[in-house]
Amino acid sequence: MKEIDVGFTHVAFVVRDLENSIDFYSRYAGMEVVHSREPDLPEARKVAWLSDRIRPFALVLVQVDAVTDTPLGNFGHLGVACSSIEEIDNKVAMARMEGILRKEPAQAGEPVGYYVFFADPDGNTLELSYGQKVGIEAFRQDDRVPAS
């Protein structure tokens, strides 16, 4: 019997340069390539699936000849939780040097926590956060995670 994946599995972004995007998400979001292929079609020259290997979810990056998708913009974003404020601040310093800091870090209290926005190589926004409760609350509603 084949395994069937059910539920929320991935988010896909169209990119101009797959290697550049892999480098960005590896350095800023701690993701690694778990699958790659080169269909060499105009709508999918190269494909990579990235994961943090913490949860069963992937960021799918697809390199195309012409990017026509609308970037997520300044607020629409991919959110990644970090293990400390210091980890975020170290990446903020890198982002400042690379000119990709989209919004200064902010402490918004519960349930948002400490967060910052960066621009990825294709204009999408990556949010790094510490202390956000998004994933935990999603499971708590289903009694899978005990209240702290």
Question: Regions from the language model: what does each represent?
Answer:
Residues 1, 62-68:
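Short beta-strand/turn micro-motifs at beta-sheet edges
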Residues 1-4, 8-16, 48-53, 68-148:
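Vicinal oxygen chelate
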Residues 12-56:
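Core segments of cupin and vicinal oxygen chelate
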Residues 39-42, 68, 107-111:
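A short beta-turn/loop motif at secondary-structure boundaries
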Residues 55-63:
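Conserved segment of winged-helix/HTH DNA-binding domains
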